[in-house]
Amino acid sequence: MVFRIASSPYTHNQRQTSRIMLLVLIAALPGIAAQTWFFGWGTLFQIVLAAITALVAEAIVLRLRKQSVASHLQDYSALLTGLLLAVSIPPLAPWWIVVLGTGFAIIIAKQLYGGLGQNPFNPAMIGYVVLLISFPVQMTSWLPPYEIAATTPDILDTLRMIFSGHTASGGDMTLLRTGIDGISQATPLDTFKTSLRAGHSVEQIMQYPIYSGALAGVGWQWVNLAWLVGGVFLLWQKAIRWHIPVSFLLTLALCAALGWLFSPATLASPQLHLLSGATMLGAFFILTDPVTASTTNRGRLIFGALAGVLVWLIRSFGGYPDGVAFAVLLANITVPLIDYYTRPRVYGHRKG
């Protein structure tokens, strides 16, 4: 009998990088479907543009670095980076916005550090923050959900808006952002913060069409619940661990509840924080990035809690309506320190 001698490892599992990334892409389908339903075809077009840009940028850099292009592209990490950025920007943002942001995320935030596994910051969030700071108007021009929109563009008009900035009838972003009440709409978090600064009371703000009959804004609560469904799928498949999303959501809810309890006239309610903006997307798809998050169980709990506090602080007192991207990057900075102080004790070690 002939025995084949193989090198280690002698045990194998299915947790390959490509499989985990593919599971995350599959888990994103409910969120993508919900955003497309409420905000139109632009979400899908932005994803296509981001995916093409991510693959091309990754291939170019890999070729320049004389590395295998095919093997690296097959891990789906570039596709996931493009997807996360695409669903974070307004559906009708100009085409160059997503191309520029995705290119920056892949080339600068990922490959410049050495590629997958070497980057200290989440590439998609780096790209998003660069776009938000550089092009605030384009990055905050969200359409109202179709239920309260005065005008809803079809597929062709969506393409025209992305590539030319106008519909076939000459309509522009200002017209499309107008709600059924004739007022230009924004996201629930943006509307809440802007209206408070304008001197409106919370009771008045909650009467706006974007909040009518909804816990956290028309359409947005369902989008967040869809991302939550995808997150539960990832937990079920053991593609992510529970520590980060649970600690993040509990901390955000606790901070929001305490703030709302002591200052209900100036701070948003817990349900608005939990079911609006990028809360569930951040909790299950962004913060859980295995490269840039903490690697110990205690560290993951601290990392998630820190991000939750930062999101609440930025939303409540900062200059931006949604602080998920900034919170993720600030939490990424602390990961080496968190991991250092939460390292498990070496087996057999006894404290002196």
UniProtKB/Swiss-Prot annotation:
Enzyme class: translocase
Topology versus the membrane: Multi-pass membrane protein
Residues annotated as transmembrane: 20-40, 42-62, 69-91, 123-143, 215-235, 242-262, 267-287, 301-321, 322-342
GO biological process: electron transport chain; transmembrane transport
Organism superkingdom: Bacteria
Annotated GO CC locations: plasma membrane
UniProt KW keywords: Cell inner membrane, Cell membrane, Electron transport, Flavoprotein, FMN, Membrane, Phosphoprotein, Translocase, Transmembrane, Transmembrane helix, Transport
Needed co-factor(s): FMN
Cellular compartment(s): Cell inner membrane
Entry EC number(s): 7.-.-.-
Pfam families according to UniProt: NQR2_RnfD_RnfE
Disulfide bond residue pairs: none
Modified residues (FMN phosphoryl threonine): T187
Function (record text): Part of a membrane-bound complex that couples electron transfer with translocation of ions across the membrane. Required to maintain the reduced state of SoxR.
Subunit structure comment from the entry: The complex is composed of six subunits: RsxA, RsxB, RsxC, RsxD, RsxE and RsxG.
PANTHER family, per the entry: ELECTRON TRANSPORT COMPLEX PROTEIN RNFD (PTHR30578), ION-TRANSLOCATING OXIDOREDUCTASE COMPLEX SUBUNIT D (PTHR30578:SF0)
Family named by the database record: Belongs to the NqrB/RnfD family.
HAMAP family the UniProt entry points to: RsxD_RnfD
Protein name stated in the entry: Ion-translocating oxidoreductase complex subunit D
Organism for this UniProt entry: Salmonella paratyphi A (strain AKU_12601)
Gene: rsxD
